[in-house]
Regions:
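A short glycine-rich, Lys/Arg-flanked "PGG" loop and its adjoining helix->strand segment in the class I
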Residues: 30-34, 102-117
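Conserved class I S-adenosyl-L-methionine
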Residues: 10-21
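A short SAM/SAH-binding and catalytic strip from SAM-dependent methyltransferases
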Residues: 83-105
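A short acidic, Gly/Pro-enriched loop at the edge of an enzyme's catalytic core
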Residues: 64, 77-87
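Conserved beta-strand signature within the Rossmann-like core of class I S-adenosyl-L-methionine
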Residues: 108, 118-127
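Glycine-rich SAM-binding Motif I of class I
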Residues: 23-27
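Conserved Class I S-adenosyl-L-methionine
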Residues: 133-160
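Short glycine-dipeptide loop
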Residues: 11-12, 35-37, 115-121
Length: 179
């Protein structure tokens, strides 16, 4: 609820979610925008022979009829209407994975183009120690690097929240480490 309020998600909003994973935030976004809103999931093609983790949400038309999937290479975000919000949680660092060969600047510009004027690009990810370049093994990224990449696409920085920040996070261990 805190993150939805911070992102100013409203009933009726049309929103996008990049790399929705297993669909946890998809469910939250769907309920937040309500029956007059819509959630567009943007993801690459699924691995061969494997359904995407968010497939159960797409299949549940009783509870999530306002959710649809659009396959993308992330350098184009083909939403059928301007979006109030594009959300990505704990996956921005994945866009830097070497095997993805993604042009981050082009991807961020595609997000910018998909948003209506005043729209929000909401990036939530695990913070690395300052100055640490992207590290796939840790599943973390330097917030300053993210900010620089996003600003370069034409965005204005509107704020950040510490509500999920853990002051005891060592930042030099993988996010799945129990410490």
């Amino acid at each position: 609820a805190d993150m939805m309020a911070f992102a100013e998600v409203q009933p009726g909003d049309k929103v996008g979610e990049l790399i929705p994973g297993a669909g946890f935030m998809t469910r939250v976004l769907s309920k937040s925008v309500g029956p007059t809103g819509h959630v567009y999931l943007f993801n690459g093609p699924p691995a061969a022979g494997r359904a995407p983790g968010f497939q159960p949400v797409l299949d549940d038309k009783t509870n999530y009829s306002n959710v649809s999937f659009i396959q993308t290479d992330f350098t184009t975000i083909a939403a059928p209407e301007p979006l109030a919000l594009v959300w990505t949680s704990q996956n921005y660092h994945d866009m830097h994975n070497p095997g993805r060969n993604l042009d981050i600047a082009k991807a961020n510009k595609a997000v910018f183009a998909a948003l209506k004027p005043g729209g929000v690009y909401f990036v939530l990810d695990h913070q690395s120690a300052p100055g640490v370049d992207f590290d796939a093994a840790l599943h973390r990224i330097d917030g300053a690097k993210v900010k620089a990449e996003v600003l370069a696409a034409g965005f204005e920085f509107a704020g950040e929240s510490n509500v999920l920040r853990n002051p005891n996070d060592p930042k030099d261990k993988g996010v799945f480490d129990p410490s």
